[in-house]
């Protein structure tokens, strides 16, 4: 993971008691990543990075929450270029 910033969020204590701090942090990061992806602000890869998940794990979370993929021809071309560079 690259450089980043910490963001402080306030949650009621009972939520922290229910989920625990670690899970609450993971869920908050995931929900932010999903919303940024849904709005088209970040790519799939960047959203997965924000959520601290692999792309495969992030795709699973999108499917679990019925979030459609934002995949256009430009992203397809980028993926084709990356695969071409790997070969």
UniProtKB/Swiss-Prot annotation:
Pfam families: UPF0175 (PF03683). Transmembrane segments: none annotated. InterPro entries: UPF0175, UPF0175_domain. PANTHER family: UPF0175 PROTEIN SSL1255 (PTHR37525:SF1). It comes from Archaeoglobus fulgidus (strain ATCC 49558 / DSM 4304 / JCM 9628 / NBRC 100126 / VC-16). Belongs to the UPF0175 family. It comes from the Archaea. This is UPF0175 protein AF_0597.
């Amino acid at each position: 993971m690259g450089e980043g910033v910490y963001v402080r969020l306030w949650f009621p204590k009972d939520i922290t008691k229910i989920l625990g701090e670690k899970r609450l942090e993971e869920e908050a990061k995931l929900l932010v990543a999903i919303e940024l992806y849904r709005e088209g602000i970040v790519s799939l890869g960047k959203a997965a990075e924000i959520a601290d998940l692999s792309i495969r794990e992030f795709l699973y979370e999108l499917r679990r929450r019925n979030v459609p993929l934002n995949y256009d021809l430009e992203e397809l071309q980028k993926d084709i270029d990356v695969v071409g560079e790997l070969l």
